[in-house]
Curated annotation (Swiss-Prot):
It comes from the Bacteria. Belongs to the UPF0502 family. InterPro entries: DUF480, WH-like_DNA-bd_sf, WH_DNA-bd_sf. Pfam families: DUF480. This is UPF0502 protein Bamb_4889.
């Protein structure tokens, strides 16, 4: 799985912003999924950044914000602007700048667009970018990306209750692993966030109060009608 002899020497890069990372992911994705419209116009690139499906997190950015991020990526040689069209169009240059093969680019792209993924999820979600024969081949490329002098991905510890480890990109810098693994509950089950737990307690109290109010209403109506609601019903 090593890079070929003619693969460019990887360059050291600064940390990317979340929007810069999203732009790179969109450019690679659309290069494979809609090749007829690639390189992308600013409008198409912005739409891809704000896409609601296959994105985590979902963004809502303007063309001005995308333009600013593109200019920064140009300085890093990660994005190039075509000159053959009256409408500016943009393409990525990740293979040459990062010095990694297309298979690794495909995996990195999915992580840029969708957030943490297991190797199985990466194989499934990258199918339109590259067809991996099996999960072990996916893991081999991921291991290479993680073993670089400047690692591009990290393998997260297995979360409580999870069957597989997830992988996360490091294009935006080092991460706090605990933010993605979550607390160990010791019981192998997913933990409930404190805010959700408080909401459940409030809902439980509201329902209990409603039941008490209805019981009082029934008792009052029964008294007015002379009915003993505690008496057993007729057997026959």
């Amino acid at each position: 799985m090593n890079t070929t002899p003619d693969m460019p020497t990887p360059r050291a890069l600064r940390e990317l912003t979340p929007l810069e990372a999203r732009i790179l992911g969109v450019l690679v994705e659309k290069q494979h999924t809609v090749p007829d419209t690639y390189p992308l116009s600013l409008n198409a690139l912005t739409a891809g950044c704000n896409q609601k499906t296959a994105r985590s997190p979902v963004m809502n950015v303007s063309e001005d914000e995308v333009t600013t991020a593109i200019d920064s990526l140009k300085h890093l040689s990660l994005v190039m602007e075509g000159s053959s069209s009256r409408v500016p169009r943009f393409e990525h240059n990740m293979n040459r700048v990062l010095g990694i093969p297309s298979q690794a680019i495909a995996l990195l792209t999915i992580l840029l667009l969708r957030g943490p993924q297991t190797a199985a999820e990466l194989r499934l979600n990258s199918a339109r970018l590259h067809g991996f024969a099996d999960i072990s081949s996916v893991e081999a490329f991921l291991d290479e990306l993680a073993a670089r002098a400047q690692p591009l991905v990290i393998r997260l510890p297995r979360a409580a209750g999870a069957r597989e480890n997830r992988w996360l990109h490091l294009m935006c810098g080092e991460v706090n692993v605990a933010d993605f693994v979550g607390p160990d509950t010791g019981g192998g089950t997913d933990s409930v966030p404190p805010s959700e737990f408080e909401a459940l307690k409030a809902e439980q109290k509201r329902l209990a109060d409603e039941v008490a109010r209805l019981n009082a209403l029934v008792q009052r109506m029964a008294t007015e009608l002379g009915i003993d609601v505690d008496a057993p019903g007729d057997a026959g």
